């Protein structure tokens, strides 16, 4: 099982996340979304739900590594489809070791 340390909670829209190695971009319905700084290609984010952890590729939204329960994966993909530009921008910031910007949760 993979365990990641918890990063700081999301802040108000327009805020910038601190310089932790794996800042938390978003949290909703018990799902936590992270992005490493920097990380290996292809561009992706990490989703954690309880004991489950998965790497999700940007664009295709395919699971690269790990797993999530089916309902959780559907919610993560629904959220990611709403925020492709923000995810891509955060990936670029992460690779440049710049602070990341939080993304709104799934409502």
Where are these regions (language model features)?
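Basic nucleic-acid-binding interfaces
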Residues: 1-5, 9-107
């Amino acid at each position: 099982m993979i365990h990641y340390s918890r990063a700081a909670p999301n802040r108000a829209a327009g805020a910038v996340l601190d310089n932790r190695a794996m800042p938390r971009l978003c949290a909703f319905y018990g799902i936590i979304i992270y992005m490493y700084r920097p990380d290996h290609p292809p561009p992706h984010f990490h989703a954690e739900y309880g004991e489950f952890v998965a790497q999700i590729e940007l664009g295709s939204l395919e699971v690269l590594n790990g797993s999530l329960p089916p309902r959780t994966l559907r919610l993560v993909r629904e959220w990611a489809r709403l925020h492709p530009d923000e995810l891509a921008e955060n990936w670029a910031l992460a690779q440049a070791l710049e602070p990341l910007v939080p993304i709104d949760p799934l409502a």
